[in-house]
């Protein structure tokens, strides 16, 4: 494979990551809107769409492996490929969170309205910004922004654990 061909395939890889990110931003917007609308059909759609993120992750991982196996990447190429692998794994996990939130939403639709945990909307906004920053970091090779995203991941995990505990407690009552 020539270097030009490699660079073209690397561009395609980065584009696949961007598309997954844009789709995830859209899903996060749907989750946020559905918390107010409490639309069972929309919740089901979000849950079903999680399979698309699973497939995107697998396809992007295949693209990464193909790049590595067909040409020996230089150090900067390895960093970009490794960043893509890490990012798509994180985005897929966020998509899983969106699906989980939608499953909780379906359960809440069946019960009396329940107030959301205090930090819930903050969590979703942080997740959305994290996706946007991740795409920007990889597109612009911005290491500082990438480090910010990594630090933010723990914050999202903590928010999600709080939310899950709160909703589980409420549903058991």
Task: Provide a role label for each language-model segment.
Residues 1-173:
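Cytosolic, long alpha-helical scaffolding segments
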């Amino acid at each position: 494979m020539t270097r030009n061909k490699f660079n073209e395939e690397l561009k395609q890889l980065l584009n696949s990551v961007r598309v997954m990110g844009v789709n995830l931003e859209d899903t996060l917007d749907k989750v946020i809107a559905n918390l107010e609308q409490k639309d069972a059909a929309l919740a089901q759609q979000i849950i079903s769409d999680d399979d698309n993120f699973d497939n995107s992750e697998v396809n992007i991982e295949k693209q990464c492996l193909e790049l590595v196996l067909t040409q020996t990447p230089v150090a900067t190429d390895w960093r970009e490929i490794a960043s893509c692998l890490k990012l798509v794994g994180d985005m897929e996990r966020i998509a899983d969170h969106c699906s989980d939130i939608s499953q909780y939403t379906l359960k809440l639709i069946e019960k009396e309205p329940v107030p959301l945990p205090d930090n819930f909307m903050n969590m979703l906004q942080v997740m959305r910004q994290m996706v946007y920053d991740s795409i920007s970091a990889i597109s612009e090779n911005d290491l500082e922004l990438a480090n910010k995203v990594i630090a933010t991941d723990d914050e999202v995990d903590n928010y999600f654990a709080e939310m899950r505990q709160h909703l589980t407690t409420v549903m058991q009552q």
